[in-house]
From Swiss-Prot:
HAMAP family assigned: HisZ
Leftover remarks: This function is generally fulfilled by the C-terminal part of HisG, which is missing in some bacteria such as this one.
The protein's name: ATP phosphoribosyltransferase regulatory subunit
Name of encoding gene: hisZ
Source species, domain of life: Bacteria
Organism: Rhodospirillum rubrum (strain ATCC 11170 / ATH 1.1.1 / DSM 467 / LMG 4362 / NCIMB 8255 / S1)
């Protein structure tokens, strides 16, 4: 088939959107299913949420952090504003606080689906992509977060990504330290940006008398084996010390349970973790663009109901970037009149059977349709 300029123009998609073609689409579906199957085998029950819902339900409480990434449309039936989900976590939290409010806690849920965002990023230009993840509702603290970390790492390994780096963070640590030092919210915000950028010289100059306490944090970023002793030795005030101790406990628990995993620590990281209220984490792998996913502890709140929650979300575009594509299943061209039992037997042996809708089912037609085999007179696949 010849593609004309007019056809090509009609196929042009907006920035950040793309078609996924064979065999990549099948590989993504299979990988998502492997991940969610591991989650389900560990007690996480599957849920499915709508792509679009009323704005007030989608952007409530901590989920307001995603408001800037949410497409909005007017519902022509109710005349109410609706939002296209930019993240599934907030929808699962809504389910837990409403339709599953009476379910016993801790409530373990798993999900997968497409999300759409207003803008991409430099590392992730895609605006539409698949998420898969877990949410642990009604449980917080180190043990719950460690469960999220370790199960996500295990699922990635079973899906084909055995070498993963876990970067452990604590978004509330720096704000707690700034409050203890008596810094204004505006100054604390500026310092947080500089510390995220690892511009410790500028942060010290801006902090004034508080420079010493903040500068000490510079040695707490990096491989856990080196950073943890430095972090443990810091003399921090009450609330900040509590966050630090939680991060230390989480790191030690993950390192003990999964010694094969590379663990790094960055208590200064905050960007993208705006609605997390405890320890958080990000996942990386060699060959993948940016983060594979992230997670942590956050408040599940809806209509005044607040309960501790934690979980993890994987970004499938990044996960697939880091994986080696498997060899495609062998394809065999078969006559459209082939007995159903014979076709099923071939498929059970791992063959993809492609029906020949014309009388010609020979080698030339097989090659044209991307089949490496045809059936011989005895019904056995032979290479062409």
């Amino acid at each position: 088939m010849t593609v004309t300029a007019k056809t090509a123009a009609r196929a042009l998609l907006p920035n950040g959107l793309r078609d996924v073609l064979p065999p990549d689409a099948a590989f993504e579906v299979a990988t998502v299913e492997r991940l969610v199957s591991v989650f389900a085998a560990n007690g996480y029950e599957r849920v499915k949420t709508p792509l679009i819902e009323f704005e007030e339900g989608l952007l409530t409480g901590a989920s307001r952090a995603t408001a800037g990434q949410t497409f909005r449309v007017m519902d022509p039936i109710t005349q109410r504003m609706m939002g296209l989900r930019a993240d599934i976590t907030i929808q699962v939290a809504r389910l837990a606080a409403s339709r599953l409010a009476k379910a016993p806690r801790p409530l373990r849920l798993t999900y997968s689906g497409q999300v759409l965002r207003v803008k991409g990023t430099q590392l992730r230009p895609e605006r539409q992509f698949t998420q898969a993840g877990i949410e642990l509702i009604g449980a917080g603290g180190v043990d719950a977060i460690a469960e999220s970390v370790l199960l996500t790492v295990e699922a990635l390994a079973q899906a084909g990504l055995p070498r993963v780096t876990v970067d452990l963070n604590c978004p509330p640590l720096v704000p707690a330290l700034c409050r203890a030092l008596g810094l204004s919210e505006d100054l604390a915000g500026e310092l947080r940006k500089l510390l995220e950028q690892k511009d410790f010289t500028a942060a010290a100059a801006l902090a004034g008398d508080a420079a010493g306490a903040l500068s000490a944090l510079s040695g707490t970023v990096g491989p856990a084996e080196r950073a943890l002793p430095v972090l443990a030795a810091l003399d921090l005030p009450g609330e900040a010390a509590g966050h630090r101790d939680a991060l230390l406990a989480l790191a030690r628990k993950v390192m003990t349970a999964a010694p094969e995993v590379d663990v790094t620590v960055d208590p200064l990281e905050h960007k993208g973790f705006e609605y997390y209220t405890g320890c958080s984490f990000a996942l990386f792998a060699q060959g993948a663009r940016g983060e594979l996913g992230r997670g942590g502890e956050y408040p599940g709140d809806l209509n005044g109901t607040v309960e501790p929650c934690c979980g993890a979300t994987l970004y499938m575009d990044a996960v697939l970037d880091g994986m080696v594509r498997p060899a495609p299943a062998p394809r065999v061209l078969v006559a459209s009149t082939l007995a159903r039992t014979t076709r099923r037997a071939l498929q059970a042996d791992g063959w993809v059977t492609v029906p020949a809708l014309t009388a010609e089912a020979g080698a030339a037609e097989a090659r044209r349709l991307g089949c490496g085999h045809v059936l011989d007179d005895e019904g056995r696949p032979v290479a062409v």
